[in-house]
Amino acid sequence: MAQNYTFTGSLTMTASSTTGYSASMSGSTTLNITGVDQIASGRIDCATGSDATIMAAPGVGRILYVKNMDDTSTLEIYEGASSDNDLIGVLKPNEFLFTIIRGTGTTTARGTSNAVTAEYFAVEIDSAA
């Protein structure tokens, strides 16, 4: 049965120089999501040469967060059931991707040179989101 959720996210970044100068930026957002049938979260090992499913095909689209937990290797994120589909992100070590995708393809990931652990969170959205 579909559920309704409120998603609240915030991000703060600070850059500091060796001379003592610093700059900060922050932002936040709240999104009410109705009719959610699918939520996926956790960590998954993404090997080279094979595709790991982050989220099965949703009805309309999804909110997606993926972080490359590896210290040395790159992670590729695809919109589709395999890496033969559209590439939507290339994450260097410790980088993350946060986006909304309006599409019904499965989200997959693959390590490029070594097996990579990905941390992920995906929520299906409806047409009103």
Language-model regions, residue ranges each:
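An anionic, turn-rich surface loop/hairpin at beta-sheet edges
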Residues: 81-99
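Short, surface-exposed beta-strand/strand-loop-strand elements in extracellular ectodomains
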Residues: 58-61, 67-86
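Interface-prone segments of viral and bacterial extracellular assemblies
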Residues: 2, 32-43
